Amino acid sequence: MAQNKKERLLWGLGLLGTAVFSLLMVWLHYQQLISTGYYYSDIPAHMAGRAMGNTGFSLVTILLRFVFGIGGNLGTAVFLGAVNLLTLLIFAWAIRKAVPQVCPGAALLWSLAANLCQAVWMPNGGYWYFGAITGTIYHNTTYIMLQPLALIAFFLFLSLAEHHGQLQWRSWAALTVLLTVATAIKPSYLFVFAPALLVALVVDLIRTHGKAIPWEVWLGCTVLPGILLCIIQAKVLFTGGDDSGMALIFTTDFDPEKVLWGVFNYSARHGLMRSLVFVGAVVLLLFRQWRGAYAYKFSLLLFAISLTEGICLTETGSRMYDGNLWWGAFICYDILLLESLIQLLCSLHKKYARR
C-alpha cells in the first residue's frame, strides 16, 4: 500500500513537472518570437531562411514557415514546445526501458532533471550557458528539432546492434530515413555518428573475423543518404570569395577570445570543465559496470569523436567564430548524459536490492 502511494505521488509530481516544463517552453519560444529588440534566439533568423547560412536552404525554414502560416507566433511556439516535450518523453522512456525498477513518475522526474541540469540561460551575462557543453539549448531551433531525431536514431541503432548478424529491415529503413531527415535539419549528428559507426563496424569486423560482413555493410549503408546530403549542404554553404570551408583550427589565424565555444577562451574552458563533472564521475567510478554496456560505450565513443571534432576543426571565412562544429558535441553530450544517468540509476537500484 505504501509503495502504491509513493508511486502515485511520483506520478503526480512527474506529470505536474512535465506540464510546467511544457508551458515554460511554449512561453519562452513565444517571447523569443515576439521580441523586437536584441535577442539571443535564432528563431527569427531561421524562419527568415538563414538556418543554412543566408541560403534559405533548410528543412527547418520550410517547417517553421509552414507552422507559422497555420498558427502564427503562438502556433510556432506550441510546435517548438511540443518538440521539447518529445525530447523529455524520450528520456523518460529510455530510463524506464533500461531500468524498469524506476516507476513512470520517477522516470519523468529524472528526465526533467537531466534536461534542466545543464540549461541555465544567461541572457544578460557574459556567457550564455553555465557549461560550454550542454544537452539542452533553448535559442537554436535547428538543435531543438534535431534533438529527438538524434535520440531516436541512437536507440534504433542499438536495436539493430542487439540483433547482430540478423538485419531488421524495418528498423534499418527507419534509421536510414531518420538520419537523413536529421541531417536535413542539422548535419551535426551525422557528422559524428558516421565516423563512430565506422569505428564500431571495424571493431566488429575484427572481433567476428569477417563472419558478419553482409550485416556490417548494410548497417554502414544507413549513413550514405545523409552523407550525400552533407555534400550538397557543403556546396551550398561554402561558396563565395571569403575562403569559406573547413580546416584544422591550429592551421588558421584566429582570435581565441572571439571563439564562442571551445577550449581557447576563459568562459568556454571553465564551462567545459563544469560540464564534465557528472559524466566524468560515471566514467571513473562505475567502470566495472559500464564496460559491459554497449549503449553506454557507444555514447562515450560518440562524445569522444564529437569533442575531438569540436576542438580540432573549424569553419573558415565569415563563419569561423560561430562555433558550429560544436553542435555535434552538444547533441552527443545529451546522449552521454542520458546513458550516464541510466548507469547511475542501475547502480543505485543494485545497491538497494542488496540491502
PLM region spans:
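Start-transfer (signal-anchor) and selected internal transmembrane alpha helices
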Residues: 1-27, 100-109
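Short hydrophobic/aromatic helix or loop-helix immediately within or flanking a transmembrane segment
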Residues: 45-78
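Transmembrane-helix motifs of polytopic, lipid-linked glycan transferases
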Residues: 78-104, 152
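Membrane-interface micro-motifs in multi-pass membrane enzymes
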Residues: 106-158, 271-273, 323-332
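Membrane-interface alpha helices of multi-pass inner-membrane proteins
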Residues: 171-187, 193
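Hydrophobic/aromatic-rich transmembrane helices and adjacent perimembrane loops
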Residues: 191-192, 318-343
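Perimembrane helix-loop-helix junctions
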Residues: 193-223
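Hydrophobic, aromatic-rich transmembrane alpha-helices
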Residues: 273-296, 340-352
